[in-house]
Amino acid sequence: MAKEELIEMQGKVDEVLPDARYRVTLDNGHQLIAYTGGKMRKFRIRILAGDLVTLEMSPYDLNKGRVTFRHIENRTRTTPPARRRH
């Protein structure tokens, strides 16, 4: 499928599920199951309940989506930043 056909939406993570999946409520109230995109999985970007995310969805299946971006504006840091080794 071509990238132009994907629908991009924003939503809030309600629940973290096993196997890097999330229950997300979109801005329009629709709930779906989303999984972490490849680059986010590669760089181990953590997504927690309450995070605002951007999703890509196929127009053929609106019950599944792929998380492509995590917005970090209103979240506080719960762990100290990792130390860099020299």
From Swiss-Prot:
Keywords in alphabetical order: Cytoplasm, Initiation factor, Protein biosynthesis, RNA-binding, rRNA-binding
N-terminal signal peptide: none
GO CC entries: cytosol
Location in the cell: Cytoplasm
Pfam families xref list: eIF-1a
InterPro entries in the record: NA-bd_OB-fold (IPR012340), RNA-binding_domain_S1_IF1 (IPR006196), TIF_IF1 (IPR004368)
Main location: cytoplasm
Molecular function per GO: ribosome binding; rRNA binding; translation initiation factor activity
UniProt domain S1-like: residue ranges: 1-72
Superkingdom in the source lineage: Bacteria
Task performed by this protein: One of the essential components for the initiation of protein synthesis. Stabilizes the binding of IF-2 and IF-3 on the 30S subunit to which N-formylmethionyl-tRNA(fMet) subsequently binds. Helps modulate mRNA selection, yielding the 30S pre-initiation complex (PIC). Upon addition of the 50S ribosomal subunit IF-1, IF-2 and IF-3 are released leaving the mature 70S translation initiation complex.
Family membership noted in the UniProt record: Belongs to the IF-1 family.
Name recorded for this polypeptide: Translation initiation factor IF-1 3
